[in-house]
Each structure stands twice: as structure tokens, then as C-alpha cells.
Amino acid sequence: MNKKLIILGKAPVQGKRGIDAKVDYPDCEVWTVGTHRIKNADRYYEFHGLKISPDGPVFRDVSNDVKAVSSLLPVNNSISAMLLEAYFEGYRDIELLGCPMIARDEYLKQKPALAMCIGFCLGNSRDSIQISWDGAPENVKYYEEYQK
């Protein structure tokens, strides 16, 4: 896919909670979960239940490719699942926004899992691939502070 993909988590992006995908990201495809106000997204994933009335297609499951690789990778959160889905569909310019994963369980388990999924995509792609994440760990040893 040549089009840039934005995967939106549930956290505010640049201080905004209410986002209109067609206005805020006009030249991009936008995927999100159906629990917060994102208007005009191209896909809504129902991993957390629907708390809004989506105005685009709703996906309730991931592809068999993602299911197969989840036996090798810790796909324990919706952002990881959507990232792998995008990778297997051929997206090569992906930006992860609104997913800092700073709550305790997210920080300890989901953030490292997403980092591993990003590494899988970057390491296994035969094509040029760009993945940016606004919540990426700044320190490789960030987990150690909870081991004391």
C-alpha cells in the first residue's frame, strides 16, 4: 500500500480527543478502536466493544496471518493486532498515535509487546518500511524500575 496509515489508540492526540479523520489526516487511511470519538475512520476494530456509533466498517477479528504469528509474538493488545494486520496487508508507512501505554499493566506488558511487533515488521519486511510510534520506549531498560 502506498497510502500512509494512521493507527489511533484511545489516548488524546496532541491534546485532542475528538478527531475527524478526514479533516485531521486527509491524505491518510485511519484505523481505530470503537471506544472513543473518531469520526470518518476507515476502519473501527471492536476489540474493546463499541461505545460509539461508527460511521465506517467494523472489524471484529484479525486475519489468519495475524493469528498464526501470534503464537510467536505477544499480541496482547489491539494496537499490536492492528499493526500486524496492516503489515500483512502491505502497508509500509504506518504511524501509531494516541497509544502511549502508560498505565501500569499497559506499561509492563503491552508496551514491550508492541515494541516486539514493530521489530518483527521492521525485521521481516523485504520492502522499505517506516513505522513511527509516539509512545515508543525511550530507554531499553525501562522495565527494570518495576523489578526492584
What are these regions (language model features)?
Residues 1-148:
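Metal-ion/cofactor- or nucleotide/acyl-coenzyme-handling active-site neighborhoods
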